[in-house]
Amino acid sequence: MLGNEIKVILLDIEGTTTSIGFVHHILFPYAKQNVEEYLKKEWDSDEIKQIVQDLQQVPSFEVYKATLVDSSASSITVELITGFVRYLIDKDLKVTPLKTLQGLIWANGYESGELKGHVYDDVKEAFEHWNNSGLKLAIYSSGSVAAQKLIFGYSTSGNLLPYLSAHFDTHVGHKQEKDSYINIAKSLETNPEHILFLTDIPGEADAARAAGLQAIILQRFGNAPLTDDEKSLNKIINDFSVLKVDK
């Protein structure tokens, strides 16, 4: 049950609302597979020109070029940038121009119907219940706000964006830092003790509690196992069904 003191529920995405494997097993491979076609189609657009320029400033770009057979080639081609983007994805290097490009490719996939944002079966019902009970819902994820909105706007349970009041990404700070949650509480104009944070990562729950928020750990199927210490220090639930508002 949720006490009357809770005014806002702040949710993580991966491992909380969405399968831990969705981003790595569906979204990343989709971007990797479709990057060349997308670049060919949009190569002359101002947006892609800027991304290509920014990618060339990434330190790994020269490292990547040195691995090529013709490493002295100076022309910037679709093939060169495609190869570098795939290299970054394989190395799991999270650089801003890559994130921006991935977001554009994913948007294309969602809009065409090729992609659906995975959410667990209990998510829509919980969102409805919490909203109907007067609670605000907000998302905090390391994925960009744009990527968050695609997952929930084109989800397997339909468009869930109307249930969500706010979205936060690493622009407010990293997820295992106390100040990030202080910044979120200020942005939401809500006292920290009135915010419940739901996540699958104990370090994030610790940071949220250090900022004065309440926190609960989701132990969904497929999530990383918790240590005995983590189990003893945290309230743990398997899904959202137990989080009913105490009328």
Curated annotation (Swiss-Prot):
Substrate binds at S141, S142, K175. It holds the Pfam family Hydrolase. Its cofactor is Mg(2+). Its EC number is 3.1.3.77. GO terms for biological process: L-methionine salvage from methylthioadenosine. Pathway: Amino-acid biosynthesis; L-methionine biosynthesis via salvage pathway; L-methionine from S-methyl-5-thio-alpha-D-ribose 1-phosphate: step 3/6; Amino-acid biosynthesis; L-methionine biosynthesis via salvage pathway; L-methionine from S-methyl-5-thio-alpha-D-ribose 1-phosphate: step 4/6. Bifunctional enzyme that catalyzes the enolization of 2,3-diketo-5-methylthiopentyl-1-phosphate (DK-MTP-1-P) into the intermediate 2-hydroxy-3-keto-5-methylthiopentenyl-1-phosphate (HK-MTPenyl-1-P), which is then dephosphorylated to form the acireductone 1,2-dihydroxy-3-keto-5-methylthiopentene (DHK-MTPene). Monomer. This is Enolase-phosphatase E1. The lineage of its organism: Eukaryota, Metazoa, Ecdysozoa, Arthropoda, Hexapoda.
